From Swiss-Prot:
This is ATP-dependent (S)-NAD(P)H-hydrate dehydratase. Catalyzes the dehydration of the S-form of NAD(P)HX at the expense of ATP, which is converted to ADP. Together with NAD(P)HX epimerase, which catalyzes the epimerization of the S- and R-forms, the enzyme allows the repair of both epimers of NAD(P)HX, a damaged form of NAD(P)H that is a result of enzymatic or heat-dependent hydration. Its main location: cytoplasm. It comes from Aspergillus fumigatus (strain ATCC MYA-4609 / CBS 101355 / FGSC A1100 / Af293). GO terms for molecular function: ATP binding; ATP-dependent NAD(P)H-hydrate dehydratase activity. ATP binds at residues 231-235, 250-259. Residues 13-357 form the YjeF C-terminal domain.
């Protein structure tokens, strides 16, 4: 297989990502490395939540849940016995009076699970059923009130388009829009961003990247500093203050479901990030009394060899690593399958991509 090309600056970032990866130690018990739930899965869309959950599992999550509509549960269960599937999402067909529902009451079975979860992925296969979306909105509000980090993709982003206040100012969530979703979000927030045609018209690649970065920064700022991964030929990652460009090469085949590898990977990385900040293991780093606020603060933490990182820095690293792993999965799968590549082929590449880009923390290597 053609070797992966990683720039020196990217290698530095991946080395920092390794700091938030929990080592494999005998003292850890089941679930201590994290529990992630994907909220999505409907009659027409059962593959997306499966691919997202499996990416999370293959990256190393201890426990993976799918919270879906009843019509999707048996199908998703049949895909893999490794996933815990909960048919708790109501839909128009499952309630007696869809026009008059108590969304908070319908959300309560899902809300009761939140105390056992470390991160959520909201949107894969969710669909646009009105009852379902109202219930998921209540779950998002409750997750935010408990500071549970979450990823929003696909129809989960539709909820933000309709009500940006759901995430505005929440620094523990990541949005992963594609080109069209990004444009809809920008329009909903009254932001004028350059069209893809305008960006493509730039003859200098650096000018194209600059315009994409500015657009991503603008959208993040309008949402109060929410982290955004703008998916494209290269991924643009921004929290409105600091922006990173993923320079890893991906595969040339585009197929539905590849973004689910991204969301699942992000779910695992968010759970690991929570464990890092909870000091679930001794990272060997020096305490850092200063919380990173500015771009200079974040860059200083990234350049530091042995200083604990702030949440703002680790959230950017989570987004960076999720993007990088997904692009490497795509590259590997495309090299192996070419035009026949399917979303499931990316799932098979998650572990090797992790080892190639990030690698096991030093404490794990002594036990492997």
């Amino acid at each position: 297989m053609e070797p992966v090309h990683v720039s020196t600056s990217s290698k530095v970032l991946f080395k920092k990502v390794r700091k938030i990866v929990p080592p494999l130690l005998e003292k850890f018990h089941k679930g201590q490395h994290g529990r992630v739930a994907v909220i999505g899965g409907s009659l027409d869309y059962t593959g997306a939540p499966y691919f997202s959950s499996m990416a999370s599992a293959r990256l190393g999550m201890s426990s993976n849940h799918v919270i879906c509509e009843k019509s999707a549960a048996t199908v998703i269960k049949s895909y893999s016995p490794n996933l815990m599937v909960h048919p708790l999402l109501p839909s128009t067909d499952s309630v007696s009076n869809p026009g008059s529902i108590d969304a908070r009451a319908l959300a309560s079975p899902i809300v009761s699970m939140l105390s056992r979860l470390h991160a959520l992925v909201i949107g894969p296969g969710l669909g646009r059923d009105g009852v379902t979306l109202k219930v998921v909105t209540e779950v998002m509000k409750e997750a935010r009130s408990r500071s549970i980090p979450f990823v929003l993709d696909a129809d989960g982003l539709l909820l933000v388009t309709e009500d940006p206040n759901l995430v505005k100012g929440y620094k523990d969530c990541i949005l992963t829009p594609n080109v069209n979703e990004f444009s809809r979000l920008a329009k909903a927030l009254g932001i004028e961003v350059p069209s893809q045609a305008q960006i493509a018209a730039q003859t200098d690649e650096s000018d194209k990247t600059s315009k994409e970065s500015q657009a991503c920064e603008q959208l993040s700022q309008a949402l109060g500093g929410v982290t955004i991964i703008q998916k494209g030929p290269h991924d643009v990652i921004s929290n409105g203050v600091t922006t990173l460009i993923s320079d890893l090469k991906g595969g040339l085949k585009r197929s539905g479901g590849q973004g689910d590898t991204l969301t699942g990977s992000l779910g695992t990385l968010l759970a690991w990030r929570a464990a890092y900040h909870n000091k679930s293991w001794d990272s060997g780093e020096q305490e850092n009394p200063k919380e990173a606020q500015s771009k200079q603060d974040v860059l200083a933490e990234l350049e530091s060899e042995n200083k604990r990182m702030s949440p703002a820095t680790t959230l950017l690293l989570v987004a960076w690593a999720g993007s990088g792993i997904t692009r490497e999965c795509s590259r590997r799968a495309f090299n192996a399958k070419g035009r026949s590549l399917q979303a499931s082929d990316l799932t098979d590449e998650v572990h090797e991509s992790f080892l190639e880009l990030i690698g096991e923390p030093e404490a794990s290597r002594t036990h492997l």
